Amino acid sequence: MGYILGIDTSNYKTSIAVIDHKKHIICDLRRFLTVKQGERGLRQSDALFQHIQNLPELMEEMRRMFDGRIDAVACSFRPRPEAGSYMPVFLAGSGFAKAAAAAMNVPVVGFSHQEGHMEAIRAYSPFQTEDRFLACHFSGGTCEVLDVSETDLRKDGMPKQYFERSSGADDNGASAKKQGADNNGASAKKAKKPHPADPAERVAYTMHITGGTKDISFGQVLDRTGVALGMEFPAGGQLDLMAQKFCEAEQAEDPGEIFKGVSRDMLQAAKEACRLTPVKVKDGWLNLSGLDTQARSRIDRLGLEQKQLQTYALAADLFAKTSKAASDMIIQCSEHSGRASVLLAGGVASSKFLRSHMRKELNGRGITAVFGDEMLSQDNAVGIAL
């Protein structure tokens, strides 16, 4: 049986995973990078340093859980599967992967972080038999609707030698021209032709961007709002819980059972005070800087802090506007492509609030939304290993 070690080093997490040839997850380890209170992310140099610290520790932990033979090592080389896509954080994982592969005398292969996100959901979904499909990548720095096609590598399956001992491992350093990018690859209007810059790198998918953001991402809006409220970065998960709780109170017969001492009138007043303007979507494209400005102006104007009722109301409306905008974007791209199903990946797509509301919105338009496992939507090394 062949076992593959996967390594991913994003702007948010250090991740290591082991899978077998039947796609069973043997080991899945992740560690958030530490961000100082009040800051909205890390500089690349700081993130790179933390990855260098985390990787040996996670490798030791992996070996305590799995002592079998590793037959190949896979890693993320770059944010997106295209020439010019580059971020220093991925040098930590690719360098560590090459060293580990050389030490174990096994092959090493690299993909893009975005391909890892896609494969982590696709491999365990109905899309695993589709060679072309519509997908969304919603994460901390990416907001894209993609027309995805398999390359010959995916159609033919992984080369047999990935599961055989080799005479050595490739040790050439990855290189690519730097581009101005948000966390893990900002949106661009057109996909460039995939062009691996490293002999160990492979391209599993070609991705053409058919919709998305023209400025910032959903993840950035959520994180900036959360940090402005005094939350730790990344803040999307905490805001998601708050949004769900407010909706639960709205649906409860007595809101006071959810928020002690709160009446329905108080709930409605909080909702009205924090109401945000909907995001306009045209031809599958949108701008999110306005939503970001609105949310933070509400925080300043109302003097909001964590745990206040109005803060929960703001979280709920922010997620509601995000859900509607994302759904509208998908609907427009679906109409243009003629595809009635969409795969959703990325950390933002792990939100329970978004999953519930978007399924309802999209199903009403005859579109099937495939989200997959919540944990596999977030940054992970499983997709890279697959």
Outline where the language-model segments fall.
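Glycine-rich phosphate-binding/hydrolytic loop that grips phosphoryl groups
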Residues: 117-120, 372-386
